[in-house]
């Protein structure tokens, strides 16, 4: 299903003219042009690099050009056509293995002769003449190369160019005769390959023995990783080798890897959260869908020129099944949409999740998630919404050396949000542990508690207790949380500037075993009330009386269950935020 969807995406891009035909890589980083004359002599080394913005800076980066399809290299010698590194195009490098460099050059020369022999093109003849006359030993000291030799050997890719006698010049990759020759060679490259019915297209075709590499996944090998691979006999069946174990045609392997590499290279289609790299795309290949989706659940709208209010309005409309105009495009809620989560695993890629649904249903799931998360926020918290990463960070000790949340948690949380399913129990466990350890109920933690219990346990009682802001629920654990906040306030008012409050010593016991903590705290509050001015004493005494009146006649509960502790923590958070809001109004 994943490979079929990616292949269909490639074909949609091809139909729209946004990607090269099979046999060509659409975007490959090239740093220099080796410009040749009619006799194959090197005329110039042209720097193709350009300035590109990177954050707040501008850096020099290689130019992305369409080039002939790249071979997948392991440890052997394998040449690429027209575009490669110095080892293959010049026969020299700084790796200290001159014999291997010469072998690379000879392999590259043989490939170009195989493809270009008999081609009636001045550029093709110049390239062949270059390979026939070039002396690899002279490369490091060549007058046109010596000055840039260090840069050329710093993982730079070079491409052939041609200059005619009249001064006109062009890259060999744009020469029609050379392109036709390469296309013919590529189309017949699988003639000797084993044939079988392709699992993706359903057609009999030559099977790809090794699939092209996937690049751009953070944490994977720089040379790329494989989504489909068989690198040990234990993974093979019925005597098959490599790709024959799961027959995918050369065309389909090229199509799906090209599509995935393009998605990974586009920041509007790709986002990394923890160790999971997420790519998403619409069936019609319109970029506005993936751009909007990443803003919906990863944030960053303002950086893309979209206000938070416009983004929220678009999400709400789509969740209700209404089309909206967004980023100069019209978003159809019925458009099929895909979300793929992958993570690195040595030389392979692991699929964390693959989801397919209508864009409107994804929007509805995200809107429901946002509604469940909605809670009174402190004045100092300027965030309109909480991203997936922000939620996962609430489970992490920010004072520890490793501040990254569990990769498993991030993946499970993403899946729950996008599918509308139950939140993972590890999310609640992580937040509960942090509250107990730090005795702090932050906005993020309170929002998680609220969302978790509303989604996983949608009882009428939970709907009554877990609200956006303070409510007058008589639920005992909720009232106890409010009461604890009032007791803390009384202590702070009676002892201005106090370094530690009852929260630091009693929060966990009050939350888990109220009967052991609250009698002591209420007695302590009576002493604090005596220190206050009359207006304050009357005000807080009234608050205490109103809250105590909502408790059962049997007294404080001996213990609270985990859901009841969640209600306690929400009550504490609501009451505390009401106090801060009133304080801000007075100021």
Show which residues each predicted segment covers.
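Short microdomains enriched in Cys/His and/or Lys/Arg
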Residues: 209-245
């Amino acid at each position: 299903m994943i490979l079929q969807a990616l292949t269909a995406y490639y074909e949609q891009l091809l139909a729209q003219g946004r990607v090269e035909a099979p046999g060509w890589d659409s975007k490959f980083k090239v740093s220099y042009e080796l410009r040749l004359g009619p006799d194959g002599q090197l005329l110039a080394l042209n720097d193709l690099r350009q300035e590109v913005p990177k954050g707040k800076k501008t850096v020099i980066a290689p130019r992305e050009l369409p080039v002939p399809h790249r071979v997948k290299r392991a440890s052997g010698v394998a040449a690429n056509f027209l575009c490669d590194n110095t080892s293959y195009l010049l026969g020299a490098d700084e790796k200290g293995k001159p014999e291997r460099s010469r072998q690379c050059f000879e392999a590259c020369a043989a490939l170009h002769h195989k493809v270009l022999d008999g081609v009636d093109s001045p550029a093709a003849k110049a390239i062949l003449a270059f390979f026939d006359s070039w002396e690899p030993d002279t490369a490091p000291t060549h007058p046109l190369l010596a000055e840039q030799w260090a840069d050329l050997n710093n993982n730079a890719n070079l491409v052939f160019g041609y200059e005619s006698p009249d001064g006109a010049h062009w890259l060999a990759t744009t020469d029609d005769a050379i392109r036709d020759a390469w296309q013919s060679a590529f189309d017949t490259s699988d003639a000797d390959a084993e044939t079988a019915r392709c699992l993706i297209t359903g057609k009999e075709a030559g099977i790809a023995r090794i699939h092209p590499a996937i690049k751009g996944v953070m944490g994977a090998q720089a040379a790329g990783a494989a989504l489909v691979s068989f690198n040990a006999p234990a993974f093979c069946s019925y005597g098959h080798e490599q790709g024959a174990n799961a027959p995918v045609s050369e065309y389909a392997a090229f199509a799906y890897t090209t599509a995935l590499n393009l998605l990974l290279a586009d920041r509007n289609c790709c986002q990394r959260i923890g160790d999971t790299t997420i790519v998403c795309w619409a069936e019609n290949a319109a970029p506005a869908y993936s751009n909007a989706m990443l803003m919906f659940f990863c944030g960053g709208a303002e950086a893309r020129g979209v206000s938070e209010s416009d983004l929220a309005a678009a999400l709400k409309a789509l969740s209700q099944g209404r089309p909206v105009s967004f980023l100069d495009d019209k978003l159809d809620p019925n458009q099929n949409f895909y979300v793929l989560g992958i993570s690195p695993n040595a030389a392979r890629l692991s699929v964390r999740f693959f989801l397919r649904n209508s864009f409107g249903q994804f929007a509805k799931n995200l809107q429901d998630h946002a509604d469940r998360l909605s809670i009174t926020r402190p004045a100092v918290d300027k965030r309109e919404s909480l991203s997936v990463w922000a939620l996962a960070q609430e489970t992490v000790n920010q004072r520890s050396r490793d501040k990254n949340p569990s990769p498993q948690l991030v993946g499970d949380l993403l899946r729950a949000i996008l599918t509308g399913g139950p939140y993972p129990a590890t999310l609640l466990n992580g937040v509960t542990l942090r509250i107990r350890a730090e005795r702090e109920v932050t906005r993020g933690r309170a929002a998680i508690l609220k969302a978790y219990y509303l989604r996983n346990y949608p009882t009428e009682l939970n709907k009554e207790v877990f609200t956006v802001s303070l409510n007058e629920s008589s639920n005992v654990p909720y009232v106890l949380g409010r009461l604890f906040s009032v007791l803390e306030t009384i202590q702070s008012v009676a002892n201005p500037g106090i370094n530690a409050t009852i929260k630091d010593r009693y929060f966990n016991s009050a939350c888990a075993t109220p009967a052991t903590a609250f009698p002591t705290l209420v007695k302590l509050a009576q002493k604090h009330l005596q220190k206050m001015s009359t207006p304050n004493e009357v005000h807080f005494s009234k608050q205490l009386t109103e809250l105590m009146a909502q408790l059962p006649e049997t007294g404080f509960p001996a213990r609270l269950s985990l859901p009841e502790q969640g209600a306690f923590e929400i009550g504490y958070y609501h009451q505390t935020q009401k106090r801060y809001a009133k304080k801000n109004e007075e100021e």
